[in-house]
Design a protein with these regions (language model features):
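Acidic catalytic/metal-coordinating carboxylates
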Residues: 32-33, 63-66
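Short hydrophobic/Thr-rich beta-strand motif most characteristic of the beta2 strand and flanking loop
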Residues: 25-40
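Two-component/phosphorelay signaling modules centered on CheY-like receiver
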Residues: 2, 11-29
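The feature encodes the CheY-like receiver
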Residues: 14, 60, 84, 88
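Short amphipathic alpha-helix used as the core "switch/output" element in two-component signaling
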Residues: 39, 65-76, 94
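C-terminal output helix
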Residues: 90, 104, 108-117
Length: 128
């Protein structure tokens, strides 16, 4: 299985998700900024790309919604989960309009977040 790519400027969120997914034997690759993800996508072969992408919506140097748009241009079938501490309706609507698989408000319940990631992985495996 390809890694789950996690994008968040908050190191503690990345750490918690990495550890929780490692317990589920799900590989991860983490990024701090959206630009790192775009560069990695441009450099990655099909087998090196993400199984799914989990991204914060608001980060210094870029928006998760802008990243969603760029990722969907490159990998239209890739499930993308958008996380945000700003659980407002406008952000959720924008995420879904941009093609997000799901919207995860922070703070999140870790078991529910892991369950959502499993569902996204299953969806991506159906797309392959």
């Amino acid at each position: 299985m390809k890694p789950i790519w996690i994008v968040d400027d908050d190191q503690s969120i990345r750490f918690v998700l990495e550890k929780a997914l490692a317990r589920e034997e799900l590989p991860t690759r983490s990024f701090t900024h959206p630009q790192e993800v775009i560069a990695a996508l441009d450099d990655a072969s099909d087998s090196e790309g993400p199984q799914i992408l989990v991204s914060d919506i608001r980060m210094p140097g870029g928006s998760g919604l802008d990243l969603l748009e760029q990722v969907k241009k490159r990998l239209p079938g890739l499930p993308v989960i958008i996380m945000t501490a700003f659980s407002d309706l406008d952000s959720a609507v924008s995420a879904f309009q941009g093609g997000a698989f799901e919207y995860l408000p922070k703070p999140f319940d870790l078991p529910k977040a892991v369950e959502l990631i499993h569902r996204a992985v299953e969806e991506s495996q159906r797309e392959e």
